[in-house]
């Protein structure tokens, strides 16, 4: 069985509506579109957002905000995650190797979350006040 060979059971689906095939079909001549008017013409119907000439809602409402591209290049790493690393110096390269951040991340901030048991040495990472005091209390160091 393949996806391209699947088909519904015979008789389970109604046949496609065939219009313009004589008055006996019930959909001959005007093909169920009535007489004249925009909706009876070929390609004739308004845009999905058309409100009869009234200013459409997406133009009445104000524009709001934007998506900051800064957030895509900065990431947070917790002390608990850093405690699992066995590197002497923890920097962006070490975090990428460990799979804690992806390649698009340009800057990392270490936050106070989780337990830190041993002294660690950070290089080139931002650190919160709480994380800084936790690292330095265990004898770790932070290089900017």
Swiss-Prot record:
GO terms for cellular component: cytosolic large ribosomal subunit. It comes from the Bacteria. Pfam families: Ribosomal_L27A. One of its GO terms (biological process) is translation. Residues 1-45 are annotated as: Disordered. The keyword Ribosomal protein applies. InterPro entries: Ribosomal_uL15, Ribosomal_uL15/eL18, Ribosomal_uL15/eL18_sf, Ribosomal_uL15_bac-type, Ribosomal_uL15_CS. Keywords: Ribonucleoprotein, Ribosomal protein, RNA-binding, rRNA-binding. The keyword Ribonucleoprotein applies. One of its GO terms (molecular function) is structural constituent of ribosome. Residues 21-31 have a biased composition (Gly residues). Part of the 50S ribosomal subunit. Belongs to the universal ribosomal protein uL15 family. Binds to the 23S rRNA. This is Large ribosomal subunit protein uL15. It comes from Legionella pneumophila subsp. pneumophila (strain Philadelphia 1 / ATCC 33152 / DSM 7513).
